[in-house]
C-alpha cells in the first residue's frame, strides 16, 4: 500500500500539472521578461528659446495701474482702424478733423497744458513787476486778532502742498531713472528677439537629422536583448512545463522502483516455493517413518503412563501445508525475463538534466535566427532615415530670414534714435525734477526759518532776520516755480502725448486683440507690410489664429506655407519595420525531441510488466498454505511428551526406544521443519508485497505509459505555443523601445524643433518690452511730473501768502485803538460851583 500511495501522488500531480500547463500555454504572461528599460535621449533642439519676459512685481505697480486708468479716461474712443489704415497707406488722405476727433481727450489735455503755459508764466511776470513796484507781497501792515489763525492755516496748507510736491518729485525721480534703465536693455532686446527667430526654419533639417541618428538607441537596446532571447525562450518553456515534466519523471522513477521490487519478490516467491516443495518431499517420508514407529510403540501393552494422549498426538504427525497446491508463476517470470532492462534511476536523472538544460539548448537552436534578427534591427526605417530630407523648409527659411533681416535693418535706425532721444529726455527730466526738488527745499527751509523767527519775535534781544530769511526762501521757490513752469508743462505734455498714444493705441489694442484683427483685415496694411506674406503663413490662417496656434505649440508646417505638406506621422510610421521583425521572430523554433521522458528499454520494461499478468496470480492460494503449519503436530511438544513417557516406563527397552524417537523428532524438527518455517516466512513476505501492489500495478503502468506518450506527443505543440507567446511578449517589449523613440521624436519635433511657439513667445516678449518695460515707466514719469507741475500753483499761492506773515509787522498808533495805546488820561477842567 505504501508503494501504491507513493505512486498515486505523482500521478495526481501530473494530472494537475497537465491542466495548468495547458492554461499557462494559452495565456500570455510577460512578467518573466522583467521590466523594460527606459531610454534616455539627448535633446536635439538648439537653444534659441527666449525666456518669457515678465515684469517683476514691485511698489510701482499700483502707480502703473493708476496711470492706465487715467489714460483709459482720456482716450474713450475705440481703435481707429480707418484712421490707421489711411496713415499707413496714404498719408495725404488723412483728415485733421478725424485725428482731432480720435484724439479728443488729448486735445482737451493740450488745451489745459496751453492755458497753463500761457497763464502761469504771465502771472509770474505780473507778479515780478508788482514786486518791483512794491505793490505785491510785502508784509502784514497791522496786527489783529485772527492773525495767528490765518498764519497757521497758510503754513499748514503750504506744508501739505510741499509734502505732495515731495511725493510727486520722488516718484518722478524714481520713474525717470527706471525708464532710463529699462529703455537701453529693452531696445537691445528687440534685435535679440528677432535673432532668436532667425533659425526657426533654417535649423530644422539639421536638428531633424540629429533626431534621426538617435534611432540607434532603441536599435542597440533591442540588439543587446536579442542576445538573451534564446535563454529567455528556453527558461519560459522550462518554467511552464516543469509542473508537468517533473511529476511525470517522478512517477516513472517510482514505477521503476516498484517494478524492480515486484520482480524481486516474484523471483523470491518462485524460488521459495521450489525450495519448499523440495523440502516437503524430503520431510514427508521421515515424518511418516516416525509416525509409524510411534504408533507401534505407544500401542504396546507394556506402555505405561499417558500413552493414549501421546498416541493421539502421534496420529496427527503429518504435513500441514502442501505447497504443491500453490499456482505456478513460471509464465509470469517468463514474461518478465530480463526485467528491468533499464536503470530507471539514472534514466530519470538524465532526463531531468536534459529538461533543465532547455535554456541553453534553446539558445543554441535560435542563434542563427537571432543573427538574422540583429541584421534586420540594424536597418533604419525609410521614414526615419528621410526625417530631415523630407522637411520642405529651404524656400521658407530664405523667405523667413529675408523678412527678419528687413525688419531688423529698418528698425535699427529708429531704435538708435529712440535711445538718443531717451538720453536727452532723461537729462531734461533730471534737471526739471531737481528744480522741483529745489522748490520743495525752499518751501521747507522757508517754513522752518519763518517758524523760528515767529517764536523769537517776542524777545526784543533777537533780531527779526530769521523770519525775513524764511520769507526770502519762500519767494525764491515762487520765482523758480514761475521760471520753470513752461519747461515742465512742455516736457509733461510731450511725454504724455507719446506715451499715452503708445499705451492706448498700441498696447491696449494689442492686449484685447484689436491689433491682430486690424492686421488680418485685407487692405489695412500696405503691400510692403503684409505680415502674412512676410511670415509665410498659410492662406487659410490669419495672424491671430497663427499666434494662438503657435502659443498652443503648433508645428511649423501647420502654420507656415511650406513647399509641400510635411507629415511627421508618416515619417514615424515604422509598421513595415516592425512587421519584418515580427516575421523574423516567427521563424524562431525550439526542438524538444531530445527530451525522451522514457527510454526504449524502460518502455519495454513497463510494457513487459503491463502484459506479464502479475495481477492475475491467485495470491490467496499461497496464503492458504502459508497459514497452515509445516507439520500439524508440534514436534517439540511431542518430543517432550515422549521424553516423559520414556522415564515413566518400567521396561528399559521401551523407554530407550521412546527416548530415541523423542531425540529423532527433535533432530528432524531442527534439520527439516525449522528451515521450512523460515522459507514459509520468506514466502509470506513476498506474497504479501505482491498481493498489495499487483492489483493496481497494471493500471498505474498503463497510466504512466499513456501520460508519457501524451506528453511526448504534445510537448512540441506546447513548446511551440509557449514560444509564440514568448515571441509576442518579446516583440511587444522591443516595440516598446521603438515606441519610446517615436514618442520622444514626436514631442521633440513638435514642441522644441519644428514648433512655431518661439514666434508667439517673441511676440509676447515684444509686447512686454514695449508696454510693460518701456511704456509703463514712461507714462508713470510724466504722470508724476504733471502731479508736481500742477501742484506748483497752490505752492506759489500759499508761499506768497505765508511769506507776508514771516516778515516783521510795522506797528503804528490808531485813533480807534483800544485803551491800552492811551498811556495817559488828562482830565479837562470844568466850571466850579461855589
Curated annotation (Swiss-Prot):
Transmembrane segments annotated in the record for this chain: 107-127, 154-174, 427-447, 473-493, 780-800
Tissue specificity remark: Present in saliva within small membrane particles (at protein level). Expressed in kidney, prostate, trachea, esophagus, salivary gland, thyroid gland, mammary gland adrenal gland, placenta, stomach, spinal cord and liver. In submucosal tumor, expressed in spindle-shaped or stellate stromal cells. Expressed in prostate cancer cell lines.
Main location per the UniProt record: membrane
Cytoplasmic compartment segments: 128-153, 448-472, 801-834
List of glycosylated residues: 270
Membrane topology type: Multi-pass membrane protein
Residues modified as Phosphoserine: 727, 818
Signal peptide stretch: 1-26
Biological process, per Gene Ontology: negative regulation of caveolin-mediated endocytosis; negative regulation of pinocytosis; positive regulation of cell projection organization; positive regulation of protein phosphorylation; regulation of GTPase activity
Pfam families, per database record: Prominin (PF05478)
GO molecular function list: cholesterol binding
GO cellular component: apical plasma membrane; basolateral plasma membrane; cell projection; cell surface; ciliary membrane; cilium; cytoplasmic vesicle; extracellular exosome
Keyword field: Cell membrane, Cell projection, Cilium, Glycoprotein, Membrane, Phosphoprotein, Signal, Transmembrane, Transmembrane helix
Residue ranges annotated as Extracellular topological domain: 27-106, 175-426, 494-779
UniProt modification remark: Glycosylated.
Protein localization: Apical cell membrane; Basolateral cell membrane; Cell projection, Microvillus membrane; Cell projection, Cilium membrane
Assembly behavior: Binds cholesterol.
Family under the similarity heading: Belongs to the prominin family.
Entry-linked PANTHER family: PROMININ PROM PROTEIN, PROMININ-2
The protein, known as: Prominin-2
Protein species of origin: Homo sapiens (Human)
Biological classification of the source: Eukaryota, Metazoa, Chordata, Craniata, Vertebrata
